[in-house]
C-alpha cells in the first residue's frame, strides 16, 4: 500500500534547496526478498510505469515546448551521454548505498527526486522505499507550471509505486 509520508530527514533532498515550493514523499513496503539497491529500484520503477503516464508526458511536452522548457523527448536524447549519468530521463545528482537522487534544472524550476531504502518498522518486516520530490521554482512560470502539474505529479508517483509492486519488485542478488 502506498502511503503519503513526511519527507525523510535523512534524505539528501531534504536539504537540496533553501526554499521549496513543493515537497512530498510517498512510501511503500518492499517484500523481504526484494532488492534494496536504490539504483536498481529507480530503474525498475521508471521502466514499468503505467502507459497513461507516457500519454500524459506527451501532452505536457506539447504544451511546455512552446515556453522553451525541457521536454521528456529532449531529455531522453541525453541518456547516451556517459559524462552525465541518467536514470530514465532524469539526471543522477547523487548516489549512496541507500539512496539515489535524480532531477533536472530548468529556467522555470529545479527539482530533485529521491528513491530511498530504509529498514522497515517493526524490524524484519521488509524495507521501506520512499520516493520523495522537492521542487524549487525560479519565477512566475515555474510557480504557475507547478500549480497545474502538482495534482498530476502526486497521482503519477502513487501509480508508479503501485504498478511496480503489482509487477513485482526486482529480487535481491544472491
Where are these regions (language model features)?
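Active-site donor-binding segments of glycosyltransferases and PAPS-dependent sulfotransferases
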Residues: 70-76
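Hydrophobic-ligand binding "helix-grip"
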Residues: 79-123
Amino acid at each position: 500500500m502506498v502511503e503519503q509520508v513526511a519527507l525523510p530527514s535523512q534524505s539528501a533532498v531534504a536539504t537540496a534547496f533553501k526554499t521549496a515550493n513543493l515537497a512530498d514523499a510517498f512510501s511503500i513496503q518492499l517484500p523481504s526478498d526484494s532488492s534494496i539497491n536504490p539504483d536498481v529500484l529507480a530503474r525498475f520503477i521508471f521502466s514499468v510505469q503505467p502507459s497513461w503516464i507516457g500519454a500524459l508526458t506527451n501532452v505536457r511536452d506539447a504544451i511546455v515546448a512552446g515556453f522553451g522548457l525541457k521536454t521528456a523527448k529532449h531529455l531522453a536524447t541525453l541518456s547516451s551521454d556517459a559524462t552525465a549519468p541518467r536514470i530514465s530521463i532524469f539526471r543522477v545528482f547523487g548516489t549512496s548505498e541507500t539512496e539515489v537522487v535524480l532531477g533536472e534544472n530548468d529556467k522555470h524550476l529545479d527539482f530533485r527526486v529521491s528513491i530511498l531504502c530504509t529498514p522497515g518498522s517493526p524490524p524484519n518486516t521488509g524495507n521501506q522505499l520512499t520516493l520523495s520530490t522537492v521542487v524549487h521554482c525560479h519565477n512566475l512560470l515555474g510557480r504557475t507550471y507547478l500549480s497545474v502539474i502538482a495534482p498530476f505529479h502526486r497521482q503519477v508517483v502513487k501509480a508508479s509505486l503501485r504498478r511496480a509492486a503489482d509487477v513485482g519488485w526486482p529480487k535481491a542478488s544472491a
